[in-house]
Curated annotation (Swiss-Prot):
Organism: Arabidopsis thaliana
Membership in a protein family: Belongs to the XPG/RAD2 endonuclease family. GEN subfamily.
Region (XPG-N domain), start-end ranges: 2-95
Region (XPG-I domain): 128-213
Residues noted as binding Mg(2+) 1 in the record, renumbered to the chain: D31, D75, E140, E142
Domain of life where this protein originates: Eukaryota
Gene that this polypeptide is encoded by: GEN1
Cofactor: Mg(2+)
Designated name of the protein: Flap endonuclease GEN-like 1
Cofactor note: Binds 2 magnesium ions per subunit. They probably participate in the reaction catalyzed by the enzyme. May bind an additional third magnesium ion after substrate binding.
Location relative to the cell: Nucleus
One Pfam family hit: XPG_N
GO biological process: DNA repair; UV protection
Binding site for Mg(2+) 2: D161, D163, D213
Protein's job: Endonuclease which cleaves flap structures at the junction between single-stranded DNA and double-stranded DNA with a specific cleavage site in the 5' overhang strand exactly one nucleotide 3' of the branch point. Structure- and sequence-specific nuclease that resolves holliday junctions (HJs) by symmetrically oriented incisions in two opposing strands near the junction point, thus leading to ligatable products; HJs are physical links between homologous DNA molecules that arise as central intermediary structures during homologous recombination and repair in meiotic and somatic cells.
Amino acid sequence: MGVGGNFWDLLRPYAQQQGFDFLRNKRVAVDLSFWIVQHETAVKGFVLKPHLRLTFFRTINLFSKFGAYPVFVVDGTPSPLKSQARISRFFRSSGIDTCNLPVIKDGVSVERNKLFSEWVRECVELLELLGIPVLKANGEAEALCAQLNSQGFVDACITPDSDAFLFGAMCVIKDIKPNSREPFECYHMSHIESGLGLKRKHLIAISLLVGNDYDSGGVLGIGVDKALRIVREFSEDQVLERLQDIGNGLQPAVPGGIKSGDDGEEFRSEMKKRSPHCSRCGHLGSKRTHFKSSCEHCGCDSGCIKKPLGFRCECSFCSKDRDLREQKKTNDWWIKVCDKIALAPEFPNRKIIELYLSDGLMTGDGSSMSWGTPDTGMLVDLMVFKLHWDPSYVRKMLLPMLSTIYLREKARNNTGYALLCDQYEFHSIKCIKTRYGHQSFVIRWRKPKSTSGYSHSHSEPEESIVVLEEEEESVDPLDGLNEPQVQNDNGDCFLLTDECIGLVQSAFPDETEHFLHEKKLRESKKKNVSEEETATPRATTMGVQRSITDFYRSAKKAAAGQSIETGGSSKASAEKKRQATSTSSSNLTKSVRRRLLFG
């Protein structure tokens, strides 16, 4: 998908590794089709409707854990140009001879798979109930994602299609992994421009040469490396026009490259003017001359010095000789490349260029995007009907998203306190939790006995200590959520959720300051106690396991004492016995000793 020829490998050195907080408070455009297709093969048959489950969990993770404002984009009617490329790709992957490819009529688009379209419709229904904006593109979803990014409606795009850069994207994220400590790759167009010296039209030119979603073949015999060398010779304003000239059979004048006519005669005439060089040292002059009189370049009193491995003469002729050879090599390379491009039919395809440079990919104004509140009742009905989930499970899984909305509203205008079904209110900060290398507050949400008014307590629970919870990375292909914990304390019901530290601090600054102050006091007290224990170590401590010899008499000690007393006598007797045995054995014949030894 996207530009062919391992195009991502060309861009990977300029990727930035970003963590959880990079997307916080940022608007991101998501290619919904990518999420649906990504894990369909891996989990197909193991869970019911994996596309709905994945979209549900990933959206909540993106909204609550990453703190982003997602905008989902779905594909519209595909371009007729892509229909032929899709059929060709299917034939090659299936091992079918491409000579039997059906011909698509001009201007006719092949409709997408009906089952896949049904999956998209179900996911759109789910997202709308979650209050997430969904946009439909006039063509490709990655094209609309790129347009939203280039026009400033979103801050980044989440799509694996590398042709998002060709459509004008400024920041592209290939994929996110909520349940992993590994950072995700983020590509900025500004870094690509400074690193490779390529701009948007340069990338379009590379895609025309190596292949793309609309022309999977490209130019035969040209890969990413050759395409990069070609487009670097032209400016952004000229590169597409120069490719048009080459496709028409014209060979443009490239600096340091092609010259008109054949320069072979000039090169051979230069070779005839070659001055003699010593075969021993490589400098000007013959070997015989250097033996008669020393070489002035070697600096010897007599003769010359044998040239080292890889020696290069720097005289004017040799330098010019190397330049001419390099010029000839470059000329030959450019002639071959231009011939390959000229043989490609209808190169470059102007319709593909216009498609990449088009901005009319969206119906309406992107500024009308808005994020609403989830319709809990309808969501419960949908998930119970589609996935056969328990209603209480659906509400629990929605809690991280609802709590994030609550904290954002609280931080924005300091009003409103109902969290979920007007039942839970902010109670306290339990602890700091570290998971996958990311710190968050564990918040206790209380369901009061009376909901007539809002109140919160500064009192810290007994478990209000800093907890560092390092868990193994999840292998769940559907990026499932952790089910919120439920606690009962003195008749009150508490729900525990993980929340962003900065968001909680903005919503409840006093409670956060109180918690951090108490945490600091506990740490200083713990440090003082440890310093006192280090300064005055005790013989026995409650935290040190005692040896079993402190409770029972050791037989080894008594045996060791006896061995010290009898050590000398036993050694002497053993020595006498050994000498007697050796003496008696020496008097026996060899055959007798063998029978005694082996029986």
